[in-house]
């Protein structure tokens, strides 16, 4: 136990150093120096734009540059990824100019079991060039219609679980039960916080979902049963290293997107600490951390 605590303190120290720095090069240097395998990290760290729901697109882009993170799960919040085609085109141009990769959109909601409504969502994502739709609420009854558009557009659907309060999709295992016999491009976005709050083992869920895991929302909780206990990653009880190990074992190719929902008006200290901690964990596993997390 003492050895584990010492290691945890060591990694947290790396996160604290990162929190005190402001340039991308210095942020990358905050990861603990350990012997490496010489292999680049197979874990791609990204950001869920909901984190910056109180900030404009330009402000978010500036913050992402400071964080050394260029992978984005964008949501139609503020002006991050507007649904209006002309405004969306400008947003895409801004991200491209900043070398930010839009890899997913959402959470996107599907309140209507109607072709026109569902097609509009897929067209929106097609214009953005994303390969994954993080879906908040498709009903079991609407899934066959959604599946039709998945096949037409070749865009994957990752249903996002929302914990004990969600009547349909409490945990990834609830999602898996209903999609396991559908098109393989229909799967899960595992929100680790919401998953833990249902009493589901996050690591076991990753293994169970397997190839139907298309996106990850990372966060940490001081109490794994309490939604309001969110803290910076590394300051809570989330088994971050075990999560990364499970993803690597399963050859997960998607992004691990930090969704930092607290301190909406001042998220940067917690984000800086969280990314430094996660990079420190990966470095402690022997991986080379790339200069930019794409």
Give residue spans per PLM region.
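Histidine-acidic metal/acid-base catalytic patches
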Residues: 2-44, 54-68, 124, 169-172, ...
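Hydrophobic faces of well-ordered beta-strands that scaffold small-molecule active sites
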Residues: 43-48, 72-74, 102-107, 133-135, ...
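Short, mixed-charge, low-aromatic patches
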Residues: 45-50, 74-78, 99-103, 129-136, ...
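Active-site beta-loop-alpha junctions enriched in small/polar residues
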Residues: 48-52, 75-79, 107-110, 138, ...
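Structural motif corresponding to the early beta-alpha repeats
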Residues: 70-156, 166, 194
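Conserved anion-binding
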Residues: 158-167, 174-176
């Amino acid at each position: 136990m003492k050895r584990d605590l010492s290691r945890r303190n060591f990694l947290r120290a790396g996160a604290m150093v990162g929190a005190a720095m402001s340039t991308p090069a210095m942020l990358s240097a905050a990861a603990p120096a350990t012997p490496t395998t010489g292999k680049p990290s197979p874990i791609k760290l990204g950001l869920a734009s909901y984190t910056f729901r109180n900030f404009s697109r330009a402000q978010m882009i500036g913050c992402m540059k400071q964080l050394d993170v260029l992978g984005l799960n964008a949501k139609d919040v503020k002006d991050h990824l507007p649904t209006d085609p002309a405004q969306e085109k400008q947003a895409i141009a801004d991200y491209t100019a900043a070398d930010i990769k839009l890899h997913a959109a959402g959470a996107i909601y599907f309140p209507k079991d109607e072709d026109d409504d569902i097609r509009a969502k897929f067209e929106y994502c097609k214009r953005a060039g994303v390969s994954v739709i993080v879906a908040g609420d498709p009903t079991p009854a609407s899934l066959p219609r959604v599946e039709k558009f998945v096949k037409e557009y070749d865009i994957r659907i990752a249903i996002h679980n929302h914990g004990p309060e969600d009547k349909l999709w409490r945990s990834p295992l609830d999602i898996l039960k209903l999609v396991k016999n559908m098109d393989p491009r229909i799967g899960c976005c595992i929100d680790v916080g919401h998953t833990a709050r249902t009493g589901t083992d996050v690591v076991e869920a990753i293994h169970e979902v397997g190839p139907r895991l298309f996106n990850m929302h990372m966060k940490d909780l001081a109490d794994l049963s309490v939604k309001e206990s969110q803290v910076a990653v590394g300051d809570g009880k989330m088994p971050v290293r075990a999560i990364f190990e499970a993803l690597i074992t399963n050859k997960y190719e998607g992004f691990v997107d930090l969704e930092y929902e607290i301190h909406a008006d001042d998220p940067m200290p917690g984000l800086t600490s969280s990314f430094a901690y996660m990079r420190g964990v990966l470095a402690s596993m022997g991986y080379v951390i790339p200069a930019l997390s794409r």
